């Protein structure tokens, strides 16, 4: 286990299994994104809320010639992921380490893929709709918005009321923001919460196998 994690009670193989996922199933997941053919090998990608970097590193493996950006406001995540990038000598990941209320760091129609993985629940709902609007602005025509639909009983509607969302409701909502559903991938996305949340870590013996695996939802900008 990486000593920088400062975690106990996780299974000794967990972080080796995560590193393997980043090089295999995770890489394959992102290689299956419905990207335009001319950018397939070298897309410009944003992972909003990159956390501890699992998806960032898998994206880097899937698109070694791409430009991978990550946004996160957590100092703990910023430190750990930054150190891993340096230690691994990765050149195609750029971190944007700050709290944001829009995607102003990116120009209109400048991105080929945006990930909103475990990023749309909680709060008052305004953040979710901001991300819908801003994703549509920064994505190129025909580019992909990929969502990992977790915590669906803790999403908010336009009035800020907690609602239980379904895939059908997510599709309908994204259609209002100019996106059409483009299917899922053979590989499932991983919900990393149990790896990094003290509540679960205290329970002990966290293994890769018990992490929630979810079908991602891919949308294309109309």
Q: Residues of each region from the PLM?
A:
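Conserved SAM/SAH-binding beta-strand->alpha-helix loop
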Residues: 74
